[in-house]
């Protein structure tokens, strides 16, 4: 018997050959389906070649089946007639699409900067706009998970910055923050953080890893090692620093929780989103990951 799989050659066995084409991920087919969904919803893809390349990156590196969220304004967004951002689309499905939300009186519209390929987000004490996923998302399944992204702090004379991540019980539980503060007391292109395993019985201790140098849109990734209580920070393909190990020996286990992805500030216990002023360019979340994923993800945008 001659067994041939997807070669185009005749099969001479006693049973028909298995057609595995439906189970083989094809970046071009995934992109075509995604584009059809975006266009049908009234959106557009400013950078179609880049979007297709991102599907290729996820598929070819074995990340597609482990990704819960992947979005970049240049890879899909919808704006209204005045240019206000309504939606930033999730490459992994509509449930993760980022929908515009607001509180109070926003100081300025939330718009897309085509040059920076980023959405500008500001929230003050008076109000503002933010982006929040359509539904709750899985944060992690394995003992190690990953966040990666690129953002920019747009005003260096305040103490705000911009945060992307998952919030539970009024706390940022898995997040990326970019911040440079007045007087340069904080200069972080990226900070990845969570709480230790004393949460949820208590608030838990804050665990974080950050760079001490600021620049806009720096490619980075945070590898959250739940079982050993450490976050590893990667930048441009290299491990830059690990966090101080948690006092409990583990990070907070979020595997039984789902919550929206929020980009802007932190959603507090009263459901108010905290102040921010920055720009969001790209974000990727893997529910299960390892060091090789962090190396690759921290090079996105280079």
Summary of predicted features, one role per range:
Residues 101-125, 136-138, 146-156, 172-250:
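Extracellular glycan-interaction surfaces
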Residues 1-128, 296-302:
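Extracytoplasmic low-complexity segments
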């Amino acid at each position: 018997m001659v067994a041939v799989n997807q070669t185009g050659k005749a099969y001479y066995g006693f049973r028909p050959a298995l057609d595995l084409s439906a189970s083989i991920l094809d970046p071009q087919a995934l992109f075509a389906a995604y584009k059809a969904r975006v266009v049908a919803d009234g959106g557009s893809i400013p950078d179609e070649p880049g979007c297709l390349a991102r599907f290729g990156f996820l598929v070819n590196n074995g990340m597609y089946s482990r990704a819960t969220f992947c979005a970049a304004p240049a890879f899909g967004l919808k704006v209204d007639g005045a240019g206000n951002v309504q939606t930033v689309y999730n490459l992994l499905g509509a449930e993760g699409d980022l929908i515009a939300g607001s509180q109070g009186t926003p100081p300025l519209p939330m718009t897309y900067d085509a040059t920076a390929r980023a959405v500008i987000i500001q929230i003050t004490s008076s109000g503002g706009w933010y982006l929040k996923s359509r539904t709750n998302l899985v944060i992690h399944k394995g003992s190690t998970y990953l966040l990666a992204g690129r953002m920019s702090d747009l005003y260096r004379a305040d103490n705000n910055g911009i945060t992307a991540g998952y919030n539970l019980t009024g706390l940022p539980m898995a997040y990326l923050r970019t911040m440079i503060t007045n007087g340069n007391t904080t200069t972080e292109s990226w900070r990845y953080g969570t709480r230790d395993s004393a949460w949820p019985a208590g608030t838990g201790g804050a665990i974080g890893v950050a760079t001490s140098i600021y620049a806009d849109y720096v490619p980075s990734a945070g590898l959250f090692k739940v079982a050993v209580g450490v976050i590893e920070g990667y930048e441009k393909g290299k491990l830059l620093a690990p966090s101080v190990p948690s006092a409990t020996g583990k990070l907070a286990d979020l595997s039984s929780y789902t919550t929206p992805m929020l980009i802007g500030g932190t959603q507090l216990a009263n459901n108010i989103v905290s102040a921010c002023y920055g720009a969001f360019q790209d974000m990727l979340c893997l529910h299960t990951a390892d060091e090789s994923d962090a190396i690759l993800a921290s090079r996105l945008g280079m």
